[in-house]
Curated annotation (Swiss-Prot):
GO function terms (MF aspect): magnesium ion binding; phosphopyruvate hydratase activity
Amino-acid positions noted as binding Mg(2+) in the UniProt annotation, renumbered to this chain: D241, E282, D309
Binding, (2R)-2-phosphoglycerate: Q162, K334, R363, S364, K385
Protein name: Enolase
Active site, UniProt feature: E204 (proton donor), K334 (proton acceptor)
Organism: Corynebacterium urealyticum (strain ATCC 43042 / DSM 7109)
EC number: 4.2.1.11
Stored Pfam families: Enolase_C (PF00113), Enolase_N (PF03952)
Cofactor section: Mg(2+)
Length: 425
């Protein structure tokens, strides 16, 4: 395999108008790989450190320091290393940084390099990225968990739940699932407009109407599904990302105008699951409310997928704690939460080995980079969360999955309902 000739970075823009890091890696055989790093709005306190410049430039959000680290220290450290040894590359990056949370060089610098090296190695091998990473086992196309109604930190809609998603579980192929999702999305616009509500969009392409409650938002989506000609719970199921750490303070959940205990929130979710065909709830409790997660998992874990995002932050050690405690039963996978591909692979492998489902995910601040689409297939995640079927930084991932499905031809399998074995409608 070819060795690394040059590693360079560029400060580019993400979908929220903030700077982010793009890295280009050139190998000595002329192969090249490029990757751009995403950034979150609602970030967990246990995530790897995203290095920002501070000061006045870009309101403190510049990434010139991270770019400079890539162009100097990291370029020097990786020179001549074999690009196909991802473990060695990532271990070199971790040792060079030297901190537990990647705060010296920044997880945004490390991740950009880690992903770009993988792209370059795939190019050198003459393989698609998903095939290079996943080998022949990478053939399952994920269910698109489409965030078609935005709330929380992703919008100014007034509703506390951050994401209301649809899951096209009844489709036969990914292409069909995308069609179903797009039709429901457009139907939702008509439903919202007919009620005199705003059809403005949130960070991830979903609509952000001002609604009074979680149930009111779900009712809009239910109406849209039926208006589009699909059967609720059979063709299309529902999912939530509550992002509850955003409204948790001093041991209390400030939810929908009331102050709730962890036990009371568990009952809120039990009521929702009873009334709606919900297959998945992400971050239903605070990122450090381990006892609450155990209680919730005991109550609803045999019925739905309970996803740890801020709880696990794609970190194998935190995931292991969750496994040991019996907290949640699924892992959200965000590459920039942990900072290298090798650590991401370890987290996914640990999850699958212990019966936890996995959902590959974007961030609210995205770029046209499509790496996570390939990773979702390579790692057999079975689910991907990358926004509404709108805004090019979201659609880019869906389009890449369409290409992968075409590439695989008869070998492609759409996860569909099998991605949610606990759901029985």
């Amino acid at each position: 395999m070819a060795g690394i000739l040059n590693v360079s970075a560029l400060e580019i823009m993400d979908s929220r108008g903030n700077p982010t890091v793009e890295v280009e890696v050139i190998l000595d055989d002329g192969s090249m790989g490029r990757a751009a790093v995403p950034s979150g709005a609602s970030t967990g306190v246990h995530e790897a450190h995203e290095l920002r410049d501070g000061g006045d430039r870009y309101l403190g959000k510049g990434v010139a320091k991270a770019v400079d680290f890539v162009n100097t220290e990291i370029d020097d450290a990786l020179a001549g290393l074999e690009a196909d040894d991802q473990r060695l590359i990532d271990q070199t990056l971790l040792e060079l940084d030297g901190t537990e949370n990647k705060s010296r060089l920044g997880a945004n610098a490390l991740l950009g390099v880690s992903m770009a090296v993988a792209h370059a190695a795939a190019d050198s091998a003459g393989l698609e990225l998903f095939r290079y990473v996943g080998g022949p086992n990478g053939h399952v196309l994920p269910v698109p968990m489409m965030n078609i109604l935005n709330g929380g930190a992703h919008a100014d809609s007034g509703v506390d739940v951050q994401e209301f998603m649809i899951a096209p579980i009844g489709a036969e192929t990914f292409a069909e699932a995308l069609q179903v999702g797009a039709e429901v999305y457009h139907s939702l616009k008509d439903v919202i407009k007919a009620k005199g509500l705003s059809t403005g969009l949130g960070d991830e392409g979903g609509f952000a109407p001002s609604v009074e409650s979680t149930k009111a938002a779900l009712d809009l989506i239910v109406e849209a599904i039926e208006k589009a000609g699909y059967t609720l719970g059979e063709d299309v199921a529902l999912a939530l990302d509550v992002a509850s750490s955003e409204f948790y303070e001093d041991g209390v959940y400030n939810f929908e105008g009331g102050k709730h205990s962890s036990a009371e929130m568990v009952e809120v979710y039990a009521d929702l699951v009873e009334q709606y065909p919900i297959v998945s709830i992400e971050d239903p409790l605070d990122e450090d409310d381990w006892e609450g997660y155990v209680t919730l998992t005991e109550k609803l874990g045999d019925k739905i997928q309970i996803v740890g995002d801020d709880l696990f932050v794609t970190n194998p050690s935190r995931l292991q704690e969750g496994i040991d405690r019996g907290a949640a039963n699924a892992l959200l996978v965000k590459v920039n939460q942990i900072g290298t591909l090798s650590e991401t692979f370890d987290a996914v492998e640990l999850a699958h080995r212990n019966g936890y489902r996995t959902m590959m995910s974007h961030r609210s601040g995205e770029t046209e980079d499509t790496t996570i689409a390939d990773l979702a297939v390579a790692l057999n995640c079975g689910q991907i969360k990358t926004g509404a079927p709108a805004r090019s930084e979201r659609v880019a991932k869906y389009n890449q999955l369409l290409r992968i499905e075409r590439y695989l031809e008869g070998a492609a399998v759409y996860a569909g309902r099998s991605a949610f074995p606990r759901f029985k409608n």
